[in-house]
Amino acid sequence: SDGEWTLELYVFSPRPLDDLLIEPNMPKLSLFVKAKKRALLINDKPYTAVSHDGRNEIIYKELPLLQGWNKLVIKLGAGDRNDFTGYFKCDNKKDFLPLLKAAFVNPETK
């Protein structure tokens, strides 16, 4: 839509985060986004599970990343461009976050 902008990033996870049944104590990864208009796609699928949904910010919870590289697309409103903040957090396993890698170009096409 008019003036909306898209942030595309690739996130590498050393292990799959999409199957709680296999591993009950799996890292739970959240994505905090500060923006009034926002939408998240993970590997081209809209993702809507949230633990917090405020007027100015949202926390997407338990991101179902696959092992290896994952494509994340964050769509933001035009007015959010200068005020956007985003970061990952892992509430239950502090040592997991440093294992993630992020890139702004697809590492698998290089």
What are these regions (language model features)?
Residues 1-25, 110:
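Extended carbohydrate-recognition surfaces in non-catalytic/accessory domains of CAZymes
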Residues 61-110:
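An acidic-aromatic loop/edge-strand motif
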Residues 13, 35, 76-78:
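Short beta-strand segments enriched in hydrophobic/aromatic residues
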Residues 35, 39-61:
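Solvent-exposed beta-strand/loop surfaces of large extracellular or lumenal domains
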Residues 17-41, 72:
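Aromatic-lined ligand-binding clefts that engage carbohydrates, nucleic acids, or primary amines
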Residues 3-5, 27-29, 36-40, 82-84, ...:
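Short beta-strand/loop motifs in extracellular/secreted proteins, especially
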Residues 1-3, 21-25, 32, 55, ...:
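Solvent-exposed loop and beta-edge segments used for protein-protein assembly and interaction
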